[in-house]
Amino acid sequence: MRLNTLSLAMAGLALLAGATPALAQKKYDQGATDKEIKVGNINPYSGPASAYGAIGKSISAYFDKVNAEGGVNGRMVKFISLDDGYNPAKTVEQARKLVEEEEVLLMFQTLGTPPNSAIHKYMNTKKVPHLFVATGATKWGDPKNFPWTMGWQPNYQSEAKIYAAHILENKPNAKIAVLYQNDDYGKDYLKGFEDGLGDKAKTLIVSTISYEVTDPTVDSQMVSLKASGADTFFNITTPKFAAQAIKKAAELGWKPAHYLNSVSSAVGSVLVPAGIEASMGIITAGYIKDPTDPQFQKGKEWDDWLAYMKKYHPSGDLKDNFNVYGYTVAQTLVQVLKQAGDNLTRENIMKQAASLDMTLPMLLPGVNLKTGPDDFYPIEREQLMKFDGKTWQLFGKIYGR
């Protein structure tokens, strides 16, 4: 009997020894446990770019959905979203709070080029994932120098080159006026546009005027741009100022060929406040499905988005593509977390973010999401579209790779 008891004890020890490696496979950095994943976010719920607050609310609602359905690999996502008012100094304060006090595993979708620029070095020094930032500045795709920061949407310079190509093809003798926000965001778009026009930039662009994000309106800039005699207008503005520019152009009776950067293309947040009639004919580039477009208001993808909006985000505007954006970018992070499995270290989060190859339900047909160790630009395809008074009408080819 003693021999049998000893044998059983030895067998039990052997089983425990065999189980140890399996238990050890779970790896966590701060912000992750068996039950929870802390995700930090900074969004302008107040201030001059508060229209973008819709994105943060949409993301939060999507994580409510994820958690209600069991979480990611059995873990709840704790989404902590703070307001910075689109003020870079406040962004720094909020980032420190999230990283050092809340101890989030990663930062996700912090919005705006100036705010993200203010914490760019901090996030990389701390080696905290600075993932899928809500800005298309070209500098977010630099894994060699900033391995902890990754963009999500198409980069601004590439988008601006699409508008330049369309102008050169359709109005080779255009007289172009440009309004841009005087910061990294505006200058990035402007550089891409000038590069896209090439040698013709100096002769085709007849007026370039900037505004400050603290300006109350861009009315005076619009008066000056009209006076330049331009027949083509590139509008590089955030939603509040985009709506003002569209409205003022109509008041002035100025009807140029109007190109609007994609970051302000939301029908609900921009075009409706600006005036539907005033917005007629505007051209922009898109990569996500416009919820006002009848061709996309059918099928499982639409039904799923609509069900999410009705159940988890009933206060959200069904005409606002910021709610499609938030839903889609949140799905991207969920995929990264799924791939990470039980290895929820910051290093593995970045490894998984840099190994994506997927499509998502509300991306435009032909647009995919792909990354690699040397490719931190997840979405690189866009298509031009024109506003017809009700919705954006897609036209032409898909640009990008």
Model-derived regions, located:
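Sec/Tat signal peptide C-region and signal peptidase I cleavage site
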Residues: 18-24
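Beta-alpha junction/loop-to-helix N-cap segments that form part of ligand/metal-binding clefts
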Residues: 25-28, 36, 51-57, 69-142, ...
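Periplasmic-binding protein-like
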Residues: 98-111, 131-133, 176-180, 229-239, ...
